[in-house]
C-alpha cells in the first residue's frame, strides 16, 4: 500500500461506527478570514480533517462555495454550512446546518431566531465562552436559551484560548457553571482567520462518533452530542494534545486511543518511514486515520 497516496475518504465504509475529526469554526475571505474556501479545504485535507464548518460572520457564501468544491473533488473534507452570529459584545454563537444568512441578534429576537434555527434542523454552539460579557443581560440570555434547549454545546477548545495564561481555570469554571449542570456537548474549533501564532486549521477540533460518514451523519452526531473536543498542534505550548468531553464519549475515545497505543508497539514490522508516519499521526491526534492504516 502506498501510504503517500492513501485516500481516507474512499476507504471509509458507509455504515460503520467510527470517529471523524472536524474543525467547526473556520473563517474565509467572505468575512474576515485570509483563505478562500478552496485554500481552506486544501489545507484541511492535507492535515487529515474529515470535515470543516466554514463559519463566516453572518454569511454562508463561503460554506456554499466549499460544498460545491467537495462535490467536484471527492478527496476533500465534507463541508458543513455554518455562520458565526453576534449577540453583542463578543457574545457569539455558531449556527451549524443553516441555509440562510442570519444578521446579528438582539435581546428581543435571539430566542425566536434560534427557535427557528432549531426547527429547521440547526445546531447552536456558544463560541469562545470566555469572551461572553459577565453582565446580567448576557448571563440571563444564556440561561433562557438553555432552559428552552436551544444551545447544543459550548466551544470550550478554541485556539485563541491558548493566549490566556489561566485558561485551565477558565475551562473548569465554564464546565462547572454551564457544561456540567446543563449536560452540554463540548466542541472544539480553531476560529481560524490567518496563519498566526499557531492558530491553524485543526488546532481546535471536534471528534464525532458517527455511523454514516456523510454530512447528515455528522449532523446527527452533533445533535446527539456524541463528541469530544480536542486541542492539538499548538507548537511549544504545554496545553497541546488535550481531550475533553462528556461521558460516555470521552471514555470511548480514550479506549480507542489506548488500543492504538497497543498496536503501535508492534510497529517493527513496518519500514522506518511508515513508523515515523504512524507515530506522527498518533501524536497529532489523527486516531481514526491511523486506525484505518493499521
What are the residue ranges of the model-derived segments?
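Acidic-and-aromatic substrate-binding clefts and catalytic sites of carbohydrate-active enzymes
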Residues: 30-34, 55-62, 103-105, 131-137, ...
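Histidine-centered divalent metal-coordination motifs
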Residues: 25-27, 57, 128, 193
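Short, well-ordered coil/turn segments that N-cap beta-strands
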Residues: 18-20, 48-51, 75-79, 120-123, ...
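Binuclear metal-dependent hydrolase catalytic cores centered on His/Asp/Glu-rich metal-binding motifs
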Residues: 91-123, 130-131, 137
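Surface-exposed amphipathic alpha-helices with a cationic face
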Residues: 16, 21, 67-72, 109-125, ...
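Short acidic, glycine/proline-enriched helix-loop-strand junctions
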Residues: 7-9, 60-80, 174, 184
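Charged catalytic cores and adjacent phosphate/nucleic-acid-binding surfaces used
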Residues: 1-24, 37-42, 87-102, 134-294
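Divalent metal-dependent hydrolysis catalytic cores, especially in the metallo-beta-lactamase
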Residues: 29, 41-61, 121-125
Amino acid at each position: 500500500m502506498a501510504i503517500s497516496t492513501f485516500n481516507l475518504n474512499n476507504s471509509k465504509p458507509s455504515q460503520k461506527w467510527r470517529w471523524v475529526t472536524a474543525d467547526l469554526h473556520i473563517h474565509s475571505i467572505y468575512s474576515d478570514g485570509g483563505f478562500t474556501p478552496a485554500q481552506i479545504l486544501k489545507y484541511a485535507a492535507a492535515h487529515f480533517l474529515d470535515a470543516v464548518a466554514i463559519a463566516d460572520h453572518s454569511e454562508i457564501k463561503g460554506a456554499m462555495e466549499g460544498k460545491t468544491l467537495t462535490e467536484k473533488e471527492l478527496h476533500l473534507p465534507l463541508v458543513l454550512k455554518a455562520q458565526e452570529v453576534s449577540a453583542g459584545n463578543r457574545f457569539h454563537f455558531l449556527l451549524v446546518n443553516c441555509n440562510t444568512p442570519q444578521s446579528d441578534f438582539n435581546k428581543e429576537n435571539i430566542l425566536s431566531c434560534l427557535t427557528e434555527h432549531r426547527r429547521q434542523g440547526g445546531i447552536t454552539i456558544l463560541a469562545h465562552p470566555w469572551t461572553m460579557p459577565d453582565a446580567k443581560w448576557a448571563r440571563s440570555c444564556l440561561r433562557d436559551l438553555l432552559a428552552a434547549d436551544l444551545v447544543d454545546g459550548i466551544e470550550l477548545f478554541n485556539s485563541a484560548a491558548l493566549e490566556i495564561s489561566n485558561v485551565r481555570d477558565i475551562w473548569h469554571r465554564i464546565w462547572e457553571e454551564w457544561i456540567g449542570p446543563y449536560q452540554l456537548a463540548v466542541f472544539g474549533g480553531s476560529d481560524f482567520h490567518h496563519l498566526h501564532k499557531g492558530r491553524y486549521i485543526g488546532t481546535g477540533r471536534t471528534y464525532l462518533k458517527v455511523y454514516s460518514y456523510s454530512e447528515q451523519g455528522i449532523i446527527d452526531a452533533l445533535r446527539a452530542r456524541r463528541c469530544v473536543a480536542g486541542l492539538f498542534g499548538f507548537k511549544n505550548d504545554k496545553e497541546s494534545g488535550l481531550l475533553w468531553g462528556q461521558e460516555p464519549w470521552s471514555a470511548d475515545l480514550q479506549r480507542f486511543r489506548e488500543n492504538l497505543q497497543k498496536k503501535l508497539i508492534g510497529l517493527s514490522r513496518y519500514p522506518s518511514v511508515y513508523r515515523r508516519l504512524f507515530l506522527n499521526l498518533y501524536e497529532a491526534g489523527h486516531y481514526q486515520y491511523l486506525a484505518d492504516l493499521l
